[in-house]
Amino acid sequence: MKIAEIKELATKELQERLDAEVAAYDQMRINHAVSPLDSPAKLKHQRRMIAQMKTVLRQRELNK
């Protein structure tokens, strides 16, 4: 998901997607600890996605 797509989402929908991404990231970390992932770069991508979502939410909060 690109930053432009993230900005188009409604705040409530963005928060729901963020919660889902955080849960998926936690699950990926657990799975990676047990047996290595095919591509550890997926963890980096997931962290970046979460950071972008949090950034957009914070920008909206400050602009109110």
Swiss-Prot record:
Gene Ontology BP terms: translation
Q: Which UniProt keywords apply?
A: Ribonucleoprotein, Ribosomal protein
Query: Pfam families, from UniProt?
Result: Ribosomal_L29 (PF00831)
Instruction: Tell me a Gene Ontology molecular-function term this record carries.
Output: structural constituent of ribosome
Provide the Gene Ontology terms for cellular component.
Answer: ribonucleoprotein complex; ribosome
> Hey, which family's this protein in?
Belongs to the universal ribosomal protein uL29 family.
Tell me the protein's name: Large ribosomal subunit protein uL29
What is the originating organism of this protein? Porphyromonas gingivalis (strain ATCC BAA-308 / W83)
- The gene for this chain is rpmC
